[in-house]
UniProtKB/Swiss-Prot annotation:
Compartment(s) where it occurs, according to its Swiss-Prot or TrEMBL record: Cytoplasm
EC number(s) given by UniProt: 2.8.1.12
Keyword Zinc attached: no
Annotated family: Belongs to the MoaE family. MOCS2B subfamily.
Molecular function, one GO term: molybdopterin synthase activity
Species the sequence originates in: Dictyostelium discoideum (Social amoeba)
Designated name of the protein: Molybdopterin synthase catalytic subunit
Pathway linked to the protein: Cofactor biosynthesis; molybdopterin biosynthesis
InterPro entries the record matches: MoaE_sf, MOCS2B_euk, Mopterin_biosynth_MoaE
Amino acid sequence: MSKESRIFIEISENIIDLNYWYKIVSDDSSGATSSFLGTTRNEFKGKSVERLEYETYEPMAIKEIEKICKTILNGFENDIKKIGIVHRIGNVPVGESSILIVISSGHRKSSLEAVHYAIDTIKSTVPIWKKEFYTDGSENQWKGNCESCHFNNNNHPH
């Protein structure tokens, strides 16, 4: 199985189907499947959030996510089985998910560490922007990726 046949990436306006993505990375040789599901929360810095809107330059976003996946496969060559990453674009209401990362591996440590690496690196390198829409109609702002997440160990909110 080539590395490319172990990587599954999608940018989509559709609601993320967890079961579909878990099936994609399912592998008889894996003993663990780890995931991260990013969800739109209802507040940010005390302001009530209605929804998020995501935009991207899709070819570049996919290329950057592929690089991240290949780095993961090279770093855990004998243990990572498959990687699935889907990121939504367009409107994502409160309670719905904007990103899912699912990674299968022979052992739990590898997939847990790989998921952590993937989300931090996606947020710091992939050209995806979000705009928060507040319930009070106050000014909405476009926000880029959190540049310091991957390089700074501070525990700050996204």
